[in-house]
Amino acid sequence: MGLLDQKFDKGGVVITAAENVLNWARLSSLWPMGFGLACCAIEMMATNASNYDLERFGIFPRSSPRQSDLMIVAGTVTFKMAERVVRLYEQMPEPRYVLSMGSCSNCGGPYWEHGYHVVKGVDRIIPVDVYVPGCPPRPEALIGGLMKVQELIREEKFAGDRREAIERLKPKKVKAEDVIVETSASAKKLQEAAS
């Protein structure tokens, strides 16, 4: 017996908004692309193992950005790697989401104060939707972050001009030199505040 063989109390019609159906389909088939850069990647790989079974949430990891709708940035993002992170993000189709996993990708981690080579948070180069704290976060925390992304998708509205929203979400072109100048300026402020 299937669902359509059963009688409905008030007729045989189900009414809902089209955006609810689209959001349900997108959140039930989330395809993340893992971008593992350091020790957080080990925990991300553990999350993909059979102990946690991400497929029960409809999450199927992909290795190509062109097939992914979620980028998981796990680990330390250096200035050399920042350009590649932006390039992969730009190759992802819309709508796209970013999950920042671990202290290093959230805010620079232990390299925050003295690491001249580390981006002080991946949100300086691409927009981040969900942050997962920890050093490194446990697989359970990553699963919680993935469920938070699914909640964001469930509540998304398509009303209004979508092109304007897409333009607002597009990352600005960032060069490593600009971030280095900004970082050195903030380092000077920290030194002045310490003295």
UniProtKB/Swiss-Prot annotation:
Identify one Pfam family in the record.
Answer: Oxidored_q6
Cofactor(s) essential for the protein = [4Fe-4S] cluster
Which Enzyme Commission number(s) are on file for it? 7.1.1.-
Q: Which domain of life is it from?
A: Bacteria
- Gene Ontology biological process: aerobic respiration; electron transport coupled proton transport
* Subcellular localization, as worded in the UniProt entry: Cell inner membrane
Catalytically driven reaction(s): a quinone + NADH + 5 H(+)(in) = a quinol + NAD(+) + 4 H(+)(out)
**What does the note under cofactor report?**
Binds 1 [4Fe-4S] cluster.
**Chain residues that bind [4Fe-4S] cluster:** C39, C40, C104, C135
- Transport recorded as keyword: yes
Main location, first listed in the record: membrane
Cite the entry's keywords alphabetically.
4Fe-4S, Cell inner membrane, Cell membrane, Iron, Iron-sulfur, Membrane, Metal-binding, NAD, Quinone, Translocase, Transport
Coiled-coil positions are none
Q: Does the keyword Membrane apply?
A: yes
* GO cellular-component term (any): respiratory chain complex I
Q: Name one GO molecular function term.
A: quinone binding
- Its membrane topology: Peripheral membrane protein
Q: How does it assemble?
A: NDH-1 is composed of 14 different subunits. Subunits NuoB, C, D, E, F, and G constitute the peripheral sector of the complex.
Member of which family?
Answer: Belongs to the complex I 20 kDa subunit family.
Q: What does this protein do?
A: NDH-1 shuttles electrons from NADH, via FMN and iron-sulfur (Fe-S) centers, to quinones in the respiratory chain. The immediate electron acceptor for the enzyme in this species is believed to be a menaquinone. Couples the redox reaction to proton translocation (for every two electrons transferred, four hydrogen ions are translocated across the cytoplasmic membrane), and thus conserves the redox energy in a proton gradient.
Protein name per its UniProtKB record: NADH-quinone oxidoreductase subunit B 2
Q: Which gene encodes it?
A: nuoB2
